[in-house]
């Protein structure tokens, strides 16, 4: 598709303010008959904070599901050198309980205006598939959810701020929880939705070597540089027609559902209340002020596609409802530099709308990216499977 034709398509797609974030369809999570998947290329992998258990629930009286149904722990992590206390959610694999040759640890970063609980449905679905033999880490980024600045007068929102925050949180998680795991089994997968995808793509090179060597791949959810930059030009109008105050958390959930911003009710009931805090009046008020990020938008997505394609690790891009790629991604796809999956029945929040499909895709990505999981089934010597590193499965 030429640049002009693609831009015209994007203009049509986003001319309606209600479709600013993504062109939603109304289909429920389906059987995937129209989804598209490309092959995964074979790639060879190239100050700690103080934490405390979060004691109170911001919206605990909503009657909706609590974080405990999705994660094992919810801790507040203080990182003075980052000027923030971060609200984190995570699941730690059971030590010495796995017969797997590798244990996946998914490290997730949400997009602008969201919170760490956007990954709750995905984490729960992964647990249903993998049991206790996996880890998952999610958190509220600066300016979002229950994460708070130590000095509110000295806060910026450049891409590098988000990147450095996440790097330090990954180090904290590794030092405090992952060191107890058998190091030879660790397989870290970076997962970023929207802005979080840009954060993950840019942080890879900043990871300490002792963590980078365990990093198996990067999965970006519904983010394309050219489209993301265009969407930012429409945010002002989107904000002008989006309510910041609701009479209750239930009203907020109902609004998101009725406007197709969340396709699964069970996902909306955990992710939407986390976007608001309860005022003394009893009403709920949106926590994140997206308008305050405007001076920093130019730094968020510049060069993302080229960065993603060139990363020296396995890469997965999952898009929702369309397959519009910019030039860098088209060339990279033709060269087999990353795997592409398109879900036709999902909105922008893939991890909420189709958590089962997203989980299946991430598990498959992990297994195919980590050579320790690959086996050859032989017809000689023994009926048992023999594991050979670096080979594909052969019947």
UniProtKB/Swiss-Prot annotation:
Catalytic activity: [phosphatase 2A protein]-C-terminal L-leucine methyl ester + H2O = [phosphatase 2A protein]-C-terminal L-leucine + methanol + H(+)
This protein's UniProt keywords: Hydrolase, Serine esterase
The protein's enzyme class: hydrolase
GO molecular function per UniProt: protein C-terminal methylesterase activity
Hydrolase found in the keyword field: yes
Entry EC no(s): 3.1.1.89
SUPFAM superfamilies named in the record: alpha/beta-Hydrolases (SSF53474)
Active site residues according to the UniProt entry: 194, 222, 348
Entry's family note: Belongs to the AB hydrolase superfamily.
Protein name: Protein phosphatase methylesterase 1
